[in-house]
Amino acid sequence: MEEKLKKALNILNIPVFNLRGDESLPENIVYKVSEVVNSYIDNEEDLIEYRITVVLFIRGGLKRKKDAIKRSLKEHGFLLSYKTPPPLISDRTDIIQQAIECRYYENVSN
C-alpha cells in the first residue's frame, strides 16, 4: 500500500516524506498512515483499513496541486474524505499547508 501511495503522491514531482518533511526544501509532501485491522466472526484479520493524512507544503498553485493529488489518489484506489480542512498560510514563509485525508482498504482474508 505504501508504494502505491508514494506513486500517487509523486504526480507533482515534489519530494515525498513519511511523517516528517525537510524544512529546508521550498515544497514537500508529508504523509502519515494509521493501520486498523478489522476482524469478524473468526477473530482473524479480514480487512485492513489504512487511514492516511497527506499534507502539502507548497508555495503557490494550491487548487491545481491539490486537485492533481486528489485525482492521482483516486486513480490509485484511495478513497478521499468528503471534508478537507481549510489551508493554513504562514505569514513568515509564504508556505501554504493543506491537509488531505483518505483511506485505503486491503482484503487479507483467504
Q: At which residue positions do the language-model features occur?
A:
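Long, contiguous binding/interaction regions
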Residues: 1-51, 57-110
